[in-house]
Curated annotation (Swiss-Prot):
Binding site residues for Zn(2+) 1: 68, 101, 164
Source species: Neisseria meningitidis serogroup A / serotype 4A (strain DSM 15465 / Z2491)
Protein name as it appears in the record: Succinyl-diaminopimelate desuccinylase
Gene: dapE
NCBIfam families reported for this sequence: dapE_proteo (TIGR01246), PRK13009.1 (NF009557)
EC number: 3.5.1.18
UniProt-listed Pfam families: M20_dimer, Peptidase_M20
Keyword check for Lipid biosynthesis: no
Catalytic activity line of the entry: N-succinyl-(2S,6S)-2,6-diaminopimelate + H2O = (2S,6S)-2,6-diaminopimelate + succinate
GO MF annotation terms: acetylornithine deacetylase activity; cobalt ion binding; succinyl-diaminopimelate desuccinylase activity; zinc ion binding
Cofactor annotation comment: Binds 2 Zn(2+) or Co(2+) ions per subunit.
Known role: Catalyzes the hydrolysis of N-succinyl-L,L-diaminopimelic acid (SDAP), forming succinate and LL-2,6-diaminopimelate (DAP), an intermediate involved in the bacterial biosynthesis of lysine and meso-diaminopimelic acid, an essential component of bacterial cell walls.
UniProt enzyme class: hydrolase
Length: 381
């Protein structure tokens, strides 16, 4: 493929150091491009976060691309082989922070829109973009707030493509059609501090928690299903003591996380954890935080259309998967009938020397255009 517009736009976006939640006028650049082909733009900024809702058309179905202009920090700049915010072509790849996650995806969808609208100026339905600068950070003032606004006025999405990097070995080999939920716990086990030579005068919270910890790690929370692996329980941090070797600690702090399937619920997991702790007589405080519920798009029109577009452009059959971390799809699913994630390789995201293959860039744009054509121009699947 010789199409170069996607590459040039990706470079323009990467060159803007939009470390979360700073947008650095990335969204302004997108608005300038899409305004020329009939998109209306609505700014929905909250705090330091910039959000934009772009839409062309007023009819249904609504096909929406969702993405984020913010990127994670670069890490030690001296470890990069080229400056992270100077997009560099090298060894058949485009290097730069945000190349994979996810400025290339945004660029590819914009250029796909430009070509599609040029060929189908009177297309069916509507095309929309939901872009935020707060996905890599706290994600409190970004997509979730925009979804609240759209939901309040009854503006729904029929088909949503989130441009997160999803490819494993080659472009198009994987589509995410769902994500696991994420539930975190911050547990404080209470004991009684004392001299280590007089354990009968103290209560060691490490010892009282140990049997409960064993049971928590061995518990089968669910068996998963055809779309989701079994729910996973993992300890992320555990800390207790004063640093001295002769003091029994007065408390133990344990941080843990569930990545849970649709076979489990937030309430059910909480109840089972409390039951195990109570069973072992643990004295504790436990604070919970759920950053996302599990969601699933059953195989249907959107997955069929995406797979057909991938097969046409990449010559491979895409696998449907729910593996990996959370994304803003967890918020958008509240107003989207069908939602998938589809983007470039995820092999170098958040890493030093983040990159994408140069020849994947025009292909990804063509895949997005193929999805639009099948959903809004009546092209056969």
């Amino acid at each position: 493929m010789t199409e170069t517009q996607s590459l040039e736009l990706a470079k323009a976006l990467i060159s803007r150091p939009s470390v979360t939640p700073d947008d650095r006028d990335c969204q302004k650049l997108l608005v300038e491009r899409l305004y020329k082909i009939g998109f209306a733009a609505e700014e929905l900024h909250f705090g330091d976060t910039k959000n934009i809702w772009l839409r062309r058309g007023t009819k249904v179905p609504v096909v929406c691309f969702a993405g984020h202009t913010d990127v994670v920090p670069t890490g030690p700049v001296e470890k990069w082989d080229s400056p992270p915010f100077e997009p560099t072509e090298r060894d058949g790849r485009l290097y730069g922070r945000g190349a994979a996650d996810m400025k290339t995806s945004i660029a590819c969808f914009v250029t796909a829109c430009e070509r599609f609208v040029a060929e189908h100026p009177d297309h069916q339905g509507s095309i929309a973009l939901l872009i935020t600068s707060d996905e890599e950070g706290d994600a409190l003032d970004g997509t979730t707030k925009v979804v609240d606004v759209l939901k309040a006025r009854g503006e729904l999405i029929d088909y949503c493509i989130v441009g997160e990097p999803t490819a494993v070995d080659k472009l198009g080999d994987m589509i995410k059609n769902g994500r696991r939920g994420s539930l975190s716990g911050n547990l404080t086990v209470k004991g009684k501090q004392g001299h280590i030579a007089y354990p009968h005068l103290a209560i060691n919270p490490v010892h009282t928690f140990a049997p409960a910890l064993l049971e928590l790690t061995q518990e089968v929370w669910d068996e998963g299903n055809k779309y989701f692996p079994p729910t996973s329980f993992q300890i992320s941090n555990i800390n207790g003591g004063t640093g001295a070797t002769n003091v029994i600690p007065g408390e133990l702090n344990v941080k843990f996380n569930f990545r849970f399937s649709t076979e489990s619920t937030e309430a059910g997991l909480k109840q089972r954890v409390h039951a195990i702790l109570d069973k072992h007589g643990v004295q504790y405080d436990l604070q919970w935080s759920c950053s996302g519920q599990p969601f699933l798009t059953q195989a249907g029109k959107l997955t069929d259309v995406a797979r057909a577009a991938i097969a046409e452009t990449c010559g491979i059959e895409a696998e449907l998967s729910t593996t990996g971390g959370t994304s803003d799809g967890r918020f958008i699913k509240a107003i989207a009938k069908e939602l998938i994630e589809l983007g470039p390789s995820n092999a170098t995201i958040h890493q030093i020397n983040e990159n994408v293959r140069l020849d994947d860039i025009p292909k990804l744009s063509a895949v997005y255009e193929g999805i639009l054509a099948r959903l809004l121009a009546g092209n056969a699947v």
